[in-house]
Amino acid sequence: MSEAHVYPVKENIKTHTHADNDTYLAMYQQSVTDPEGFWNEHGKIVDWIKPFTKVKSTSFDTGHVDIRWFEDGTLNVSANCIDRHLAEHGDDVAIIWEGDDPADDKTLTFNELHKEVCKFSNALKDQGVRKGDVVCLYMPMVPEAAIAMLACTRIGAVHTVVFGGFSPEALSGRIIDSDAKVVITADEGVRGGRAVPLKKNVDEALTNPEVKTISKVVVLKRTGGNVDWHGHRDVWWHEATAKVSDVCPPEEMKAEDPLFILYTSGSTGKPKGVLHTTGGYLVYAAMTFKYVFDYQPGETFWCTADVGWITGHTYLIYGPLANGAKTILFEGVPNYPNTSRMSEVVDKHQVNILYTAPTAIRALMAKGNEAVAGTSRSSLRIMGSVGEPINPEAWEWYYKTIGNENSPIVDTWWQTETGGILIAPLPGATDLKPGSATRPFFGVQPALVDNMGNILEDTVAEGNLVILDSWPGQMRTVYGDHERFEQTYFSTFKGMYFTSDGARRDEDGYYWITGRVDDVLNVSGHRMGTAEIESALVAHHKIAEAAIVGIPHDIKGQAIYAYITLNDGEFPSAELHKEVKDWVRKEIGPIATPDVLHWTDSLPKTRSGKIMRRILRKIATGDTSNLGDTSTLADPSVVDKLIAEKAELV
């Protein structure tokens, strides 16, 4: 592909930043040569009830994987996110809520948030919730979702948030695995102008005979829609909080007490319950938020993620609030009621830092200048990308069109399992290359290894991305299945955390994530990441989105099968077919030319916007007898449509 353009650090950022390049290099060096000293100092970014004296006790050894940080310290997460700001900033805005309907919005100050969290903490206690109990949240994107999470942390309950788009089957599986005691939900959610039947889904999930632990369901009235009511079990939020005190002292928690379980889909079998603990997670969330987004006091931060994903946990709730930031909770979608909604929200709330996903960026990019019509976005200072590698063309569009070429982009690489960002630029320190996540965060030691686990020492290299030592935000185990934790992350390459991603490192030591290792093609002995070919395809001015899978080929081993979605107003033709193949040949080389072009107007995506490649692989190879779990798909009907289109290709 064409050589990346380099964007130097902007002068206006350089003059007022937490870390310039010299600071980054010095801090990073200390963080990897003396992690104990580094985190002993920076662990103090949060307030401790009992200060820690032990910083790090970690092992990646087979059979003895054990991760503990700050283990003899005690603290409370909600006190760090709320109480410690009250004396000086109690009247400052903590949460801005922007409803699905642009006419709906409200704010909560830290004082107001404190009162609501204390009341709901007491309401949870009234429902029998005690320290260590698991509480399941199945909520719309409303302030009460944040209030419920913070209330759990206040009383020492463990929350497990299930994205409100998941099916009753997916919800019941997570309730069963986590032994949750209480479910918190709403009558309905609202998204893109449509009602989401949350309470109905909970009722259905709880009919599963394997669900044996739920004693209460707390229901928030969001729309006032009709719901079935089970008097012995169901409780209205407004009634549960009406008569309780608004004083609730925070529970003193050990650093290694569980904070939350968040489920991520496993490649096989049941979902994995990723367990994060209290001290290390909060330190890492606060630290990465402050430095990666170069957060300055008084700024407004908007992470567009749902609270049901790790990005929503770390960079919508805990990271911003621990730093006393104003955080925006957005109920809607970026293109409703019109394509410029995201830009309108930026202007309306004078957003300084915007953090969104390549999927959203590409969807807006397909609409061209409509995405910014009638808006200035002049308040933006920093923009971020999360969820998957961002292709250079989408990066450039985001930078130029949304950001007016004024805001550096922090392209962040991390996972549910990592708790926070592992590789990303720092705005005041790192020259940017579109498509590269650039350099590791403090304390993170990435390496590239070959398939035998040998570390590739050369600066320029490509291989499997591993992390050589622990960091505070790392998950501690798979809930209830430590052996699965070891097998999944530490058995492929001994003594290393395997990310399951591939990456290449360039001459400047920058990392370029090439995609999941199982998304690597081997065509005539040439290894290629699917992300690289997809990037080349979406660089074509007529293509909105592309997904690449490999299919068996008698001669080449694998052939390249491309699913392609065109921009509005473009249509497939024999000329375009040839043009697209020639384009990839020019961008990457003949070896990367797709063998099959499958034109379609929609791809199978999970509700978080990730393309479900497993299904695309099966459709491409004609193996559609067992497509596995499709409960997490946003629109399951896409699958039948793709199968029908495939039949016409043959």
Swiss-Prot record:
Question: Short name of one Pfam family for this protein?
Answer: ACAS_N
What GO biological process term is on the record, naming one? acetyl-CoA biosynthetic process from acetate
Q: Which UniProt keywords apply?
A: Acetylation, ATP-binding, Ligase, Magnesium, Metal-binding, Nucleotide-binding
Q: Which GO terms describe its cellular component?
A: cytosol
Name its co-factor(s). Mg(2+)
Q: Which top-rank group of organisms is this from? A: Bacteria
Modified after translation how?
Acetylated. Deacetylation by the SIR2-homolog deacetylase activates the enzyme.
Would the keyword Acetylation be found if you checked this record's keyword annotation?
yes
Positions that bind Mg(2+) = 538, 540, 543
Instruction: State its Enzyme Commission number(s).
Output: 6.2.1.1
Please report which protein family the annotation says this sequence is part of. Answer: Belongs to the ATP-dependent AMP-binding enzyme family.
Q: Briefly, what is this protein's role?
A: Catalyzes the conversion of acetate into acetyl-CoA (AcCoA), an essential intermediate at the junction of anabolic and catabolic pathways. AcsA undergoes a two-step reaction. In the first half reaction, AcsA combines acetate with ATP to form acetyl-adenylate (AcAMP) intermediate. In the second half reaction, it can then transfer the acetyl group from AcAMP to the sulfhydryl group of CoA, forming the product AcCoA.
Q: What is this protein called?
A: Acetyl-coenzyme A synthetase
| Originating species | Vibrio parahaemolyticus serotype O3:K6 (strain RIMD 2210633)
- Taxonomic lineage of the native organism: Bacteria, Pseudomonadati, Pseudomonadota, Gammaproteobacteria, Vibrionales
Q: Which gene holds the coding sequence for this protein?
A: acsA
